Amino acid sequence: MSGASEPPASFAARLLRWQRQHGRHGLPWQGTRDPYRVWLSEIMLQQTQVATVQGYFARFIQRFPDVAALAAASSDEVMALWSGLGYYSRARNLHQCARQVMERFGGQFPRSAALLQTLPGIGPSTAAAIAAFCFDERAAILDGNVKRVLTRHLGDASDLAVAANARALHARALALLPANSADMPAYTQGLMDLGATVCTPRQPQCGRCPVAADCTARQQGRPESYPVKTRKLRRSAQTLWLLLAQTLPEAQSACWLEKRPAKGIWAGLHALPVFDSRQALLDALPASASVAWLPPLAHALTHKDLTLHTARVHLPATARLPIAGQWRRDWPDLGLPAPMRRLLQQQQA
């Protein structure tokens, strides 16, 4: 019919055109087909802002330029370099993954999303990103940003906390992929960029969106209603008591550190001794110890708000505390929880 408007180009075509003109192009892990760098960036970017990741990524690449160097490193080296980035299970899996790439695949990352998922710490979306960016595989990423873009565009109001609904969304994501596998790197980056810069959780900029013309959520006037996920972890609060025990003389001071259990808060990290009560901390000290209480610290974990009370004591280097651990002067080179590293740095200043 004369004068009828043409249907919009495919979702993929519009996204590709937008990404090439308006997407992000200057990030340090872009412009490479090296799966080591892509994998490292994808793991770091989980639950962490781009601005925070850039410095850590640069330091990791400088220290461990390839997967062989990372695999050969000690756990303490890896955890120390990761310290402050949070979600420390990522660092443990990162190290284990590097070693498995060396042992199982001869130092070469597998070239398919299916095989990539057999490695520690690589889930379906991370595997899809590596396979798409490095090997042009038509694999669909489905991280938080992408779920938001797709559920809004498709008007998918199903509860993504239900596994069957998440699988159905993945199938719809596969149907939207570009036909040409060579377009997969730009398409995948475009989805990430759109979710991060335009289709944001709050106040999305629909006027800048390349796929707004047929976006269901925009037509409904309620984009912030998507995605739907009813099962959410509730935040909790916890108070902990830390022991900052240092040897004399202060100028060459060592501190008493323990190794945290494999599970729980700060799992596997070196740490100041942690107690559940003030009295339990005091009971671990020699009767002659003079305690100075530092100002309490607030520290937020993923779904827990911590209040940290720190007791500072000075003891002879020959002292042995009735708790696990040892005197360490090399704490700057160890993987420590961020609030404890800050405490030690402040006491050394």
Model-identified regions with their sequence ranges:
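Intrinsically disordered, low-complexity, charged terminal extensions of DNA damage-control enzymes
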Residues: 1-25, 31, 193-349
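Catalytic cores of DNA base-excision repair glycosylases
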Residues: 7, 13-207, 211-220, 224, ...
